[in-house]
Curated annotation (Swiss-Prot):
Residues 668-973 form the Protein kinase domain. Residues 553-572, 583-592 have a biased composition (Basic and acidic residues). Signal peptide: none annotated. The lineage of its organism: Eukaryota, Metazoa, Chordata, Craniata, Vertebrata. This is Serine/threonine-protein kinase LATS2.
């Protein structure tokens, strides 16, 4: 593929068509009119001027407007015919005989091809070298190997204005902004006579630029094996030194590369693989730049001659408003071609696309200073329409490597030189076309990135209160060595090459201060005392150099700044903001750090997690099976069944998403406290988003850990999560935070059985029969799930809106699972005592607060004291089976013992083993054979008396050994139909509820004292528990979080019944809605 270059003309055809057109025009010179043409040997000059002038006009017109396909070349051909008319009738033999051998030798020595030079002299009649050169330039298209050189010549045609005009000797063009003019009229004076040759080296300085290019042509494109023989030179070394040789290499056309001593072969700049040549760099890949006065013969063939004193100046981008687009000019020193003239401003404009680096001036010339636009801001000037100030160049270091230009077309092939010949320093054209690399999209590759070298950053602009200094005149030029020592060294990272310093002077109005914060002695004290920029920078540099050991002067200035109190109120230097971290963020970061847990904790967690995952999957399968069974019973059609399945799938998806949402107590608002227990409290709470009502039970972690209740809490969570029946309070959410555990459950507004016993004292036998029958079914459902409640008592039996019961508070429940065993939550060989076991705290009645209330009757006072013990921090052993207290091993029969004790209390009015202290109560329970007596004055039916004695007995003879059917078959329940759903039957007692948030059925609770006292008492135990020697188990509350699949927004009960006359009217509708709710409880997955 040909490289993308800039066409030298607007001609739309290809080069072959253009050559064919020129050949046809040259073969028919007689078609053009020849009248009025001057004859004579001196007519060539005028014709040439006319031709050149017309070419200039043609190129300018081509730039202004579009021309036909062959329009400009018709005019050019006509003018060529004018110049060839005097020789149209000459024969080739006669012309060949008249060839001037001296001119032929001079042209050959100048680098022209011998055949081309002979043909040119034949056609021009050996009149002058000027005419021969003109012919060679016109016939360059006929040589295909010089096609790209001709392309360069055409690009520098007069219409483009790319060639410099011959300049007069003046000191410098710097800052003038002049652009090179077009070609001037060619005069043959420099080529005639003895001034051309070794005796007249200055002729090249006054020679027009294009003809210097023609006299010193570069070698065209060659293959790897092609050898180009250079003709011998006929001029002296001084003329040779006047030009620089740029061999045009590569597969397309040549790219000059400058090499100086010390530069390694290959590319000195690290480039990405997409721009690197896959062929090895050739040894002679860079041209030699001979210097003036170089010793030795020209043909010495030095591989690395001393660098030329020249400037390698890139031109602006072709889109910029500049006359020279992508041209690279080699400007010699004062003794060489154009040496006396500095390049104009347009030449010194840097180019971004050519990716060139600047060479540096050599010789005895003075070091120029950097302009105001520094390197850091150089790219900001590379925009179309912007005139960049001239870039002065830094003194060149001969011992430092110079990076070459980066280009994707630098694929150099090794080209051996002529055998037996030393490589001469051949001149080359002064203009070279810069190739713009095409944008190639490469796949992303992992490229090793070199570590960047630290460089000095440019500080921010000085504060507004510091007056900008007036632009000072440029300082006197200093030698390169002094500049290197006086200025800061900037290390430029070059691949494999050592870093070399650059002399950079940040002068002019754009000088910048060091970055803030500034030292205290530089702070502004008052408006009258203004620091100029130089003093600020000097003071900052001094403070930075001083480091921790500051000089005495700095201490004095600091003391004076501190002592000046008036200056504190003045405006200070704005320093960089210092980030301030909040304590809360620090805590979050500390909490978010990954903690290291023991392998035992990991094992504990994984075993529970795997069990819960399997359980969750099984529940999902059961829900699908339940849906299919319900749809089969309902006889739904296939479309309806598919719709119900989609509804279930959507619910499953929502459930999985909601399970991942983190919950905290801020999602609930506490309304009122319902009760206080041993480890926490139960309160009525409202969910913020749905305004649903829940009963939220809060347990303090420190009390749970201190009382060794972790296993019990886990058991309660498991039973509430797995229980999905009407006899157990439904758990909706369970979550935890740093201090507490939370259970969010159904709110049962009817209160508990203990409150009803305190109010009614003694139940009628039919009411007791109803509650005991429902309690039997509730315990049976717990046993069927594989759990043992172990704490059945009136406080844990709740009465719902319709008067039916529900079990709650499974804190002492166990399912004979390993997670419900306390030993898995303890460390060491010391085992803590279970809370159900006898304790010295049972004799502590300091927590009893019944004495604070007025005692109207002795019996009522005893009842209230009993309630106080039930809600105390240690509980009461009144309802616990003796085998549990004796630690002899127990089964689910211990729950049936509790049923007999509750039946006794309902019918008699007090527990059978009531005692002043828990210890005495425990002793009575253990010696139940001697202490259990049914009062004679209490009139009980024989069935009730028999049931009590068969339940409160030894475990071997207790009812319930064969399950709940033993109790259902007892004569005491002859009036109860267990075959039908007892919850659908109307209850003998229905609590009075006025509104959904009515808590009148619960005992009033002092919301502060018991809780605060408990927290104060347990703080010491918590401190002891969390000490380094007795650290609490880290795996205590794994897998505690829970979310129920079907959330009915906290309204498991119907709307409260109206009071008074409206009750009878709404009773039938209430019963129907009750039946609907009860029917859907078993198949809730079906309904959304």
């Amino acid at each position: 593929m040909r490289p993308k270059t800039f066409p030298a003309t607007t001609y739309s055809g290809n080069s072959r068509q253009r050559l064919q057109e020129i050949r046809e025009g040259l073969k028919q010179p007689s078609k053009s009119s020849v009248q009025g043409l001057p004859a004579g040997p001196n007519s060539d000059t005028s014709l040439d001027a006319k031709v050149l002038g017309s070419k200039d006009a043609t190129r300018q017109q081509q730039q202004m407007r579009a021309t036909p396909k062959f329009g400009p070349y018709q005019k050019a051909l006509r003018e060529i015919r004018y110049s060839l008319l005097p020789f149209a009738n000459e024969s080739g033999t006669s012309a060949a005989a008249e060839v001037n051998r001296q001119m032929l030798q001079e042209l050959v020595n100048a680098g022209c091809d011998q055949e081309m030079a002979g043909r040119a002299l034949k056609q021009t009649g050996s009149r002058s070298i000027e005419a021969a050169l003109e012919y060679i330039s016109k016939m360059g298209y006929l040589d295909p190997r010089n096609e790209q050189i001709v392309r360069v010549i055409k690009q520098t045609s007069p219409g483009k204005g790319l060639m410099p005009t011959p300049v007069t000797r003046r000191p410098s063009f710097e800052g003038t902004g002049d652009s090179f003019a077009s070609y001037h009229q060619l005069s043959g004076t420099p080529y005639e006579g003895p001034s051309f040759g070794a005796d007249g080296p200055t002729a090249l300085e006054e020679m027009p630029r294009p003809y210097v290019d023609y006299l010193f042509p570069g070698v065209g494109p060659h293959g790897p094996g092609h050898q180009h023989q250079h003709p011998p030179k006929g001029y002296g070394a001084s003329v040779e030194a006047a030009g620089a040789h740029f061999p045009l290499q590569g597969a397309h056309y040549g790219r000059p590369h400058l090499l100086v001593p010390g530069e390694p072969l290959g590319y000195g700049v690290q480039r990405s693989p997409s721009f690197q040549s896959k062929t090895p760099p050739e040894t002679g890949g860079y041209a030699s730049l001979p210097t003036k006065g170089q010793g030795g013969p020209p043909g010495a063939g030095l591989a690395f001659p001393p660098p030329a004193a020249g400037l390698y100046v890139p031109h602006p981008h072709h889109k910029q408003a500049g006359p020279a687009a992508h041209q690279l000019h080699v400007l010699g020193s004062r003794s060489q071609v154009f040496a006396s003239d500095s390049p104009p401003q347009s030449l010194l404009t840097p180019s971004r696309n050519s990716l060139n680096v600047d060479l540096y001036e050599l010789g005895s010339t003075s070091v120029q200073q950097w302009p105001a636009a520094t390197l850091a801001r150089r790219d900001s000037l590379q925009k179309p329409g912007l005139e960049a100030p001239p870039r002065a160049h830094v003194a060149f270091r001969p011992d430092c490597p110079v990076p070459s230009r980066t280009n994707s077309f630098n694929s150099h092939q090794p080209r051996p030189g002529p055998p037996g010949k030393a490589e001469p320093s051949l001149p080359a054209p002064n203009t070279v076309t810069a190739v713009t690399a095409a944008h190639i999209l490469h796949p992303v590759k992992s490229v090793r990135v070199l570590r960047p070298e630290p460089q000095t950053a440019v500080g921010p602009s000085h504060p507004a209160w510091v007056p900008a200094p007036a632009p000072a005149p440029a300082p006197a030029p200093a030698p390169a060595a002094e500049g290197l020592d006086a200025k800061e060294e900037h290390a430029l990272a070059l691949g494999g090459a050592g870093a070399f310093p650059l002399d950079v002077e940040y002068g002019g109005p754009d000088r910048r201060c060091p970055p803030p914060p500034y030292p205290k002695h530089l702070l502004l004290r008052s408006k009258s005392e203004q620091y100029d920029l130089d003093s600020l920078c000097a003071g900052m540099e001094q403070s930075l150099r001083a480091g921790p050991n500051e000089p005495e002067g700095g201490d004095k200035s600091r003391k004076s700044a501190k002592g000046d109190k008036g200056g504190k109120d003045k405006k200070q230097i704005q320093t960089s903001p210092v980030p301030v971290r909040k304590n809360s963020r620090d805590e979050e970061k500390r909490e978010s750090r990954i903690k290291s847990y023991s392998p035992y904790a990991f094992k504990f967690f994984m075993e529970q997690h795997v069990e819960n995952v399997i359980k969750t999957y099984q529940q999902k399968v059961n829900r699908r099976l339940q849906l299919e069974q319900e749809m089969a019973k309902a006889g739904l059609c296939e479309a309806e069944q598919e719709q119900m399945r989609k509804i279930l799938y959507q619910k499953e998806s929502n459930y999985n998403r909601l399970k991942r949402a983190k919950m905290d107590k801020s999602m609930f608002v506490k309304i009122k406290t319902l009760g206080i227990g041993a480890f926490g409290e139960v309160c009525l709470a409202c969910k913020v988003d749905t305004h649903a009502l829940y009963a939220m039970k809060t347990l303090r972690k420190k009390d749970v850990l201190n009382r060794n209740q972790v296993a019990h809490v886990k058991a309660e969570r498991d039973i509430l999560a797995e229980a999905d029946n009407e006899w157990v309070v439904k758990l909706y959410y369970s979550f935890q935070d740093k201090d507490s555990l939370y259970f969010v459950m159904d709110y049962i507004p009817g209160g508990d059985m203990m409150s009803l016993l305190i109010r009614m004292e003694v139940f009628p036998e039919h009411l007791a029969r109803f509650y005991i029958a429902e309690l039997t079914l509730a315990i049976e459902s717990v046993h069927k799930m594989g759990f043992i409640h172990r704490d059945i008592k009136p406080d844990n039996i709740l009465i719902d809106l319709d008067g039916h019961i529900k079990l709650t508070d499974f804190g002492l429940c166990t399912g004979f699972r390993w997670t419900h065993n306390s030993k898995y939550y303890q460390k060491g060989s010391h085992v803590r005592q279970d809370s159900m076991e006898p304790s010295d705290l049972w004799d502590d009645v300091s927590n009893c607060r019944c004495g604070d209330r007025l005692k109207t009757l002795e019996q009522r006072a005893r009842k209230q004291h009993q309630r106080c013990l039930a809600h105390s921090l240690v509980g009461t052993p009144n309802y616990i089976a003796p085998e549990v207290l004796l630690r002899k091993g127990y089964t689910q029969l211990c729950d049936w013992w509790s049923v007999g004790v509750i039946l006794f209390e309902m019918l008699v009015g007090q527990p059978p083993f009531l005692a002043p202290t828990p210890t005495e109560t425990q002793l009575k329970v253990i010696n139940w054979e001697n202490t259990l007596h049914i009062p004679a004055q209490v009139k009980l039916s024989p069935e009730a008396r028999d049931l009590i004695t068969k339940l409160c007995c030894s475990a071997d003879h207790r009812l319930g050994r064969n399950g709940a059917d033993d109790l259902k078959a007892h004569p005491f329940f002859s009036a109860i139909d267990f075959s039908s759903d007892i919850r659908k039957q109307p209850a003998p007692y229905v609590p009075t509820i006025s509104h959904p948030m009515d808590t009148s059925n619960f005992d009033p609770v002092d919301e502060e004292s018991p809780w605060n006292d408990a927290s104060e008492g347990s703080t010491k135990a918590w401190d002891t528990l969390t000490s380094p020697n007795n650290k609490h188990p880290e795996h205590a509350f794994y897998e505690f979080t829970f979310r129920r699949f079907f959330d009915d927004n906290g309204y498991p009960f119907r709307c409260p019944k109206p009071s008074g006359a409206e009750a009878s009217q709404a009773e039938s509708s209430d019963l129907e809605s009750s039946d609907l709710v009860d029917q859907t409880e078993g198949c809730q997955p079906v309904y959304v």
